[in-house]
Amino acid sequence: MEAGPVRWVSFTHVFFDCDGTLVGVEGIVELTRRRGQAMAVAALTEAAMSGHLPLEAVYEQRLALIRPTRAEIQELIRIYREHLLPDAAGVIHALHACGISVHLISGGLEEAVRGLGRFLGIPAQRIHAVRPRYDPFAGAWWRGEEGPAVGVEPSPLIAQDGKARLLEGFRAPGRRLMLVGDGITDLIAQGAVHLFAGFGGVFHRPAVAENAEVYIRCPRLAPILPLALSPERARALQGTPAEGILREGLQAFRNGEARFRDPVRHERFLQVWHAL
């Protein structure tokens, strides 16, 4: 917000990370539990998401440790749904009701992320994830059964700056882009969007907490609604269950569970919403 009249402009597009943001797990770690490699993969994942190792250095290394089958990746859809944050579906439904274009942008495996997106009512063309490459000869190929995933198709999302590069392609006159995520790849994309909200409700990553323009500490996504909507746009939620989620989100900003890095901007944001 600029100096002058206090106002907040609605966003046109909101991009959510998946693992550690919409859901309370890291999918790649869940895939390892049957392989006895959970600790090794969790350590690699945390190193990448905290910025200690570049994502491209660990992505295929993690996949090689577990070599998941298509059936196991499909099983992730169930795991994602079981660990979906309690208000995630309500927040996304409210954004849709207000005409916001909601996208998922994730370094996760495409089939699982798309399955979650279907459950949340997000069209496939708004889901951006990594497509695995299967070994067609390692399984029961004579019955049409593929072998395990042995790599991934080329994608910017397996690189540390991949989300930033992908989001740059969405910038256009009249669009306002917002990104919500918990990891270093999300933080790196901060310059590609008009607002980045770091999410620490599942995993606390110090670099994200210290550098995100907005940081959310609570294990809820309700603060996204007042960030994404203007008070005028939010009138569409009056009298619906989403109005309660909006109020919860504002309360998080008032009690410090969500905050702007710039305290002046934080106060001006609260002024915009003082009537609710």
Residue ranges of each PLM-predicted region?
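Non-catalytic pre-domain segments flanking phosphatase-related domains
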Residues: 1-18, 25, 37, 244-276
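Alpha-helical substrate-recognition element adjacent to the catalytic core
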Residues: 2-131, 135-136, 219
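Anion (oxyanion) recognition and catalysis
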Residues: 96, 118-121, 171, 191, ...
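Acidic, Mg2+-coordinating phosphoryl-transfer loop and its flanking beta/alpha structural elements
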Residues: 106-107, 174-216
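Histidine/lysine/aspartate-rich catalytic loop segments that bind and position anionic ligands
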Residues: 122-156
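Short, charged, surface-exposed secondary-structure boundary motifs
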Residues: 135-141, 206-213, 225-229
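A polyampholytic, Gly/Pro-enriched intrinsically disordered region
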Residues: 143-159, 220-223, 233-246
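Conserved Lys-Pro-Asp/Glu-containing loop-to-beta segment of HAD-superfamily phosphomonoesterases
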Residues: 151-185
